[in-house]
């Protein structure tokens, strides 16, 4: 077996306990990667202990964490690991993932960690265009995306995307976050000056899980939907994770290919 034949792809995700969105997002990303690179075995790891434990208890589904996956890769005789994270940004989750992966580096010839969804200028522009093509908001509506938000410096990506929407002429597309400075409350003043016929909410997250179901579109008083309706706006919600969008999944394929190309250069 040649060196590159001992290569595997490890897809690392935060995870979700919502089966429907898991199949449409994480599993679809994995499927696309498998079909794009069928010569390499594909492994999966999730980083959320809470979600992994919930799936184990509720559904009897065991999903490996990073340590288990890296140990399994070694046991299977894999010598080169190309890691493709399914994170949107390179934040705290990404930092922790890299630390755990690289703790096993001594067990392999090469460990390549590919980019998260949005790292380069091209990535961000491609996601911007993908969102516009997927949702194509009407001229009298506001399309407000719910990102996660973080205290990490990578949080700058969210206002950057908001500006990018405007740069490409999508003046009615806006970005907000569950955490951080881009909250729904901070958006309300801006909204009053826009006078939309209605507001369309959609998640800017790989999966349409707990945040999309509860924080965005839930019936509790503190959901974005409820807050906007209380202000008198007509609101519609789309529970579609970024992972459902082909153009988004294509970016992950591109990043994995770049990782495999780097590995080929190292092995040359």
Model-based region annotation:
Residues 1-268:
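Active-site-proximal alpha-helix that buttresses catalytic centers in soluble enzyme cores
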